[in-house]
Every structure is written in C-alpha cells, then in structure tokens.
C-alpha cells in the first residue's frame, strides 16, 4: 500500500469510513486485484462474475485470525476493510489509506458481523454435498488430503459420499464453521 498504517494506533473516532458497504467491498476487491469502475456499486453479485464469492457471518477476533483474510466490517455505522490484527491493534483500509486503531476500540464498535471473499475452486457452481461429483468435488478431496497430511492419488470423478461428508464436518469444526457437511457457502 502507498499509505501504510502508522506504528501508533489512531482513535477510531478520528477515522472516517465509507457510508455504504459497496465502497468497503470495493476496497476488499482491490486487495484481490480487482477494481470496479464505480466503486460504490461493488457487490457480491458482481464479485461472482469474476469467480469470487462472499461469505457473511458473525465471528470473534480469534476466528478472524483463523480466517487469515481481509474482511468488510461495520463500525459505528461506517464500513471498513479490516486487513490485519496484530498485538492490540487493527489495520483498517479506507480507499487507499491504512489506519491502525486499538483493538479495544474496534471491539467496542463491532457487532461481529463480517463479509469475506473467497475464490471458487475449478468447476464450483454451488455448495457441494452428498451425491455430487465433478471438478469441484475432486478439488475438495485433494485439498482435504493436503490439510490432513494424507497422500495418495485421487481418481477424477470422485463422488461426495458419507466418508467425505465426515471429513468436511471435521474441517468445519476445527475452523469454527457450522459443521453441516456441505462444502461452500
């Protein structure tokens, strides 16, 4: 970034965020290398046209660290992109400026709601579950093998079965997601 956060946190009260969520989402999209012509019109629907999907939920700071991704958050009715949490301070992006604020102030102003972006695997069209097959299921099997330190080839055309559902649920539990056994948003 051209304007790095200062070493010393600034009070959140002194920082002006965006009035609309779309502008903060555009800041997030810029981190993915995407810049829409009209930043206020950025939306999850537009992001999907370039293979990025939104995930919105409620979480705490520990989960934010586990996600290890920038997120859009609302603080005191203003929208920011949270790009980093580190030792008592949080880095917030507004347009091309990064502000460092005390985490305690962020917690006082934040409800826990957030939106993050994620890139869809090859062949992903919708959440995948029992009975599905195709490139997205093959990708999921390979990723879970890597995550679980397992080796071995997988044959294309793998069917999402009960065993894979258990692995997905285990992954969801360890990452703080709802363990529904469905992969995707």
Residue spans for each PLM region:
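Surface-exposed beta-strand edges and their flanking turn/coil or helix-capping segments
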Residues: 105-107, 116, 131
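Short acidic, glycine/serine/threonine-rich helix-capping segments at coil-helix boundaries
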Residues: 128-137, 142-185
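Cell-wall glycan-active module
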Residues: 1, 91, 115, 135, ...
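Acidic/histidine-rich, surface-exposed loop or edge segments in extracytoplasmic proteins
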Residues: 3-12, 116-127
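Extracytoplasmic/periplasm-facing segments of secreted or lipoprotein envelope proteins
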Residues: 19-24, 28, 125, 129-136
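A structural motif
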Residues: 111-120, 140
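Conserved active-site-adjacent core of cysteine acyl-enzyme catalytic domains
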Residues: 1, 7-111
């Amino acid at each position: 970034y051209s304007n790095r956060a200062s070493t010393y946190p600034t009070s959140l009260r002194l920082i002006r965020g965006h009035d609309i969520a779309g502008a903060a989402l555009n800041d997030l999209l810029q981190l993915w290398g995407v810049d829409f012509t009209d930043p206020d019109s950025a939306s999850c629907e537009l992001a999907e046209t370039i293979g990025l999907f939104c995930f919105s939920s409620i979480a705490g700071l520990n989960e934010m660290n586990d996600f290890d991704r920038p997120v859009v958050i609302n603080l005191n009715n203003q929208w920011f992109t949270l790009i980093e949490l580190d030792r008592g301070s949080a880095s917030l992006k507004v347009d091309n400026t990064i502000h460092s604020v005390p985490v305690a102030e962020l917690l006082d102003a934040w409800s826990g709601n957030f939106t993050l972006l994620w890139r869809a695997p090859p062949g992903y069209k919708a959440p995948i579950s029992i009975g599905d097959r195709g490139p997205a299921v093959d990708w999921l099997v390979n990723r879970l093998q890597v995550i679980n330190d397992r080796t071995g080839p997988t044959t294309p055309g793998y069917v999402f079965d009960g065993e894979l559902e258990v692995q997905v649920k285990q992954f969801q539990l360890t990452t703080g997601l709802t363990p529904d056994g469905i992969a995707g948003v």
